[in-house]
Amino acid sequence: MARVSTYLNFMGNAEEAFDYYRTVFATEYLGPIQRMKDVPADPNGPTLSEAEKELVMHVELPILGGHVIMATDMLESMHHELKIGNNTTINLEPDTREETQRLFDALSEGSTDCAPLMDMFWGATWGTCLDRFGVRWMFNYTPSP
């Protein structure tokens, strides 16, 4: 089933923030917190410190009305910089690959900052774009089993 969620970026305190939100909304995580150490190492990427390996790669928390907020920690070693405009992303999870492509093509029109749709290690087709109005969109299509 298609869904829309809000994706939040943090600089090292995603777990602290989400522990707080979990208490505020009296809810539980949708699955375990995924850590940076759980990501397959990129031989061309930076070597993560032990502290960075423990940071949040991905977490999901249902809040009001079933809306899900998600988060990650941005890594300075990967030259990520948290600033207004990249701290919040609208995550789209369409039902089909075709709909994912259609939405990506439409929202990336006129954009200069996109990561094209690609197959990822977690089994999804994923991409991002900052649209011409300055809104960041993330696309995640996972085929049904």
Where are these regions (language model features)?
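Detector for Asparagine
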Residues: N9, N13, N44, N86-N87, ...
